Amino acid sequence: KMKRIVLISVLFSFVFLSHAQIWKVPEGHETRWTSFENPTGAKGTAAQANKGAKGSAFGRIMAGDSCVLLSQQGPGIINRIWLTVSKRNPKMLRALRIKFYWDNSVVPAVDVPLGDFFGNPLSRTSRFENCFFSNPEKRSFNCCIPMPYRTGAKVVFVNTSDEDLTHLFYDINFTKLPEWDSEMSYFHAVWREDKSTKLGVDYTVLPQLSGRGRFLGVSLGIFANKAYETTWWGEGEIKFYIDG
C-alpha cells in the first residue's frame, strides 16, 4: 500500500510540474515568429503586405541567390523551424542549403544541404517522424531542436543550383531571452559526402571534437555496393570515443 501511495504521489507531481510549464509565463521571455509575412519577427509588424490578409506567403530564390530567414540580436533560442519548397527532387534538395550563424560569427555552425539537414539523406524524401525532425507528407520539413544563442543568430537559405526556386515557404519560432544561461550550449552540425569507403578501414562519421557537449544523433544515407545486393551490407559496429 505504501508503494502505491508513493507511486501515485510521484506521478501526480510529474504531471503537475509538466503542466506548470504550460501556464507559467517566464519573466522577460518574448515569443516571436519570422516568415515572409514578418521577416524581422518584430511585434506588431505581421500581415502588412495585403491589408491584414495573407499577402506574402512565399518567396522566390533565384539561382545563385540566398535569403535570410532569421536575423536577431541579443540572447534567444530557436524553438522550431518549418519550411517547404516547390522543387523537391534529389538534385534540388542537395543544391539548396541551410546555414546557421551564432553570435555574429562569419563562420557558420551549420552548413548542410536542405534534404540532408532535415533527415532525408541522399535527398530522397520519405514520411517519417522522430523527436527532432519530421516530414509527415513527404513535402514539408520540420525541426524542433532547441538552438540557443548568446548575442545573435542568423539563418540563411541558399540556392546553389542553376535553377530558380519559385516557391519557398517557411516560418521560424524563437524566444527572446533576458539573459544567457551558462548551462546552454550551441547547436552544430557537420555534413560529409564520400563516394566510397575502404574495406577494413573505419569510416569517421563525426570528426574529433573537444569541449563539453551532447551528441544528438546522426542521419546516414548509403548506396550499397552491388556485391551485397542479395545480402545484408550493414555488418560492423558503431564506435564511440568519448573523453579520449
How would you name each of these model-derived features?
Residues 21-244:
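Beta-strand-centric surfaces of beta-sandwich/beta-rich domains
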Residues 5-15:
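Sec-dependent N-terminal signal peptides
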Residues 16-20:
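Sec/Tat signal peptide C-region and signal peptidase I cleavage site
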